[in-house]
A protein has these predicted regions:
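Interface amphipathic segments
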Residues: 1-178
């Protein structure tokens, strides 16, 4: 299987003082997911949130389900987020990290390697993206930031040098975006 789990469990409780929920699962290859959330009455009709979410995926084989163009994906995905604020104005603080990403794209004749991405959320209003990816003798760097609101602007910058974008019999494409 591309993604297996064991010991999956959820638990919830409704009380006058608080509503709580938990999720836990051991994933294949030593991965796991764990989350806790608690809602307590706040001022007026507000519900105050307090919780966290942790994720560790030590196998990225599931990526092959998302695209038939990507084969042999590798690397590790981890996340650690704190949940706070209120139900009407939640705050999410934390980071999602992709480390050691590698994959092949046979149609383009390339092997991606040493990929690294960090997505940091600040106050559920803003996120910052940073990453890099190697192919051939070159590297791409990505950086960006944006907001989570529907009308929030998002900026992404891609820079690089000598990144092998395609290596097929008809063409060898090396890019250096700035």
């Amino acid at each position: 299987p591309l993604r297996g789990y064991a010991g999956f469990g959820t638990e919830g409780a409704l009380h006058d003082a608080a509503t709580t929920a938990q999720v836990r699962a051991a994933l294949d290859h030593g991965g796991r997911i764990a989350g806790d959330i608690k809602m307590t009455p706040g001022e007026g009709e507000q519900q105050v949130l307090d919780g966290n979410l942790e994720l560790e995926l030590n196998s990225l084989a599931f990526i092959e389900l998302l695209s038939s163009e990507v084969t042999n994906p590798g690397g590790r995905l981890s996340a650690n987020y704190a949940i706070a604020g209120t139900l009407s104005a939640p705050r999410l603080d934390g980071t999602l990290n992709l480390d050691g990403f590698a994959a092949e794209i046979p149609a383009a004749g390339i092997k991606l390697k040493e990929g690294k991405v960090s997505l940091r959320a600040n106050d559920a209003q803003r996120y910052v993206l940073e990453g890099s990816l190697n192919s051939g003798e070159g590297k791409l760097l990505i950086s960006g930031e944006g907001g989570l609101a529907a009308d929030a602007p998002m900026t992404i910058s891609i820079k690089g040098e000598q990144f092998l974008a395609a290596d097929i019999p008809a063409a060898r494409v090396v890019i250096s975006p700035d």
